Regions:
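Active-site-proximal beta-strand elements of phosphoester/diester hydrolases
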Residues: 3-13, 92-101, 160-164, 211-214
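Core catalytic region of metal-dependent phosphoesterases/phosphodiesterases
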Residues: 8-9, 13-90, 175, 182-183, ...
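Proline-aspartate-enriched helix->loop->beta-strand connector
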Residues: 28, 158, 163, 177-194
Length: 226
């Protein structure tokens, strides 16, 4: 096990060398990608030097094109996508993941309207066959968040929750992610997507957890929570 901190990586959008350098220089015990990966080759090839430390969630741009999708979902690191589950690192830290974004065609909580679909299977059943991707929902919606994604995660416990979307402290965030974090008992949330890193520390006591955003191609080191 590498003895260093956890390395959280804001949306790489196809750029990798800064992540590899930071992982090696810090001896990071885990490298955690916050979505919008957009690798031009299979992800395991892009991160070959550090692949055994990598965990990730997908972002909305990872379903923009078939190549993006294949390089993430069909890479040899596909089993390191922690969307919808909790993984326990060798140091004992439990990390939960929620990839993708809220979309009005599925569910956009800030509009205060009922979800149109509860889950991907329900959505796929109402999608014309010619519009399905890999016999499921259209390609774009492989990165949409469904209510059941959050319901299933809320039954689990974790120390850190990583999301692509921002929680409620952010101007463009979602209170539903605050509630998810509290139900899971997490101490810390970390997100990408917004390409910024806003100081939310004034909200931590009220919301019940620490929250961090990592900017575009940004990096954040955090000690594990043994």
């Amino acid at each position: 096990m590498h003895p260093g901190p956890l390395l959280f990586c804001g949306d790489p959008h196809g750029q990798w060398q800064h992540i590899i350098d930071a992982a090696l220089n810090s001896n990071a015990r885990a490298v955690i990608l916050l979505g919008d990966l957009e690798p031009t080759r299979p992800l395991h090839m892009e991160l070959e030097a550090i692949w055994e430390r990598v965990w990730f969630i997908h972002g909305n741009h990872d379903t923009d094109h078939a190549d993006n999708f294949a390089n993430v979902w069909h890479s040899e690191l596909a089993d390191r996508n922690i969307h919808g589950r909790v993984v326990t690192l060798a140091c004992g830290t439990r990390i939960a993941g929620l990839g993708g974004i809220f979309r009005g065609a599925v569910w956009y909580p800030n509009d205060q309207q009922a979800p149109k679909f509860r889950n991907r299977d329900e959505h796929a059943s109402q999608t014309p066959r010619q519009e399905r991707w890999q016999n499921s929902v259209p390609l774009k919606h492989w990165s949409s968040i469904y209510p059941d994604d959050i319901d299933q995660l809320s039954r689990l416990q974790a120390d850190i929750l990583i999301t692509h979307e921002a929680p409620g402290y952010h101007e463009h965030g979602f209170k539903e992610l605050d509630e998810l974090a509290r139900r899971m008992g997490v101490r810390t949330t970390v997100h990408g997507h917004q390409h910024d890193s806003i100081d939310s520390s004034a909200r931590w006591v009220e919301q019940g957890f620490q929250s961090f955003g990592v900017g575009l191609r940004g990096l954040m080191l955090l000690d594990g929570l043994e």
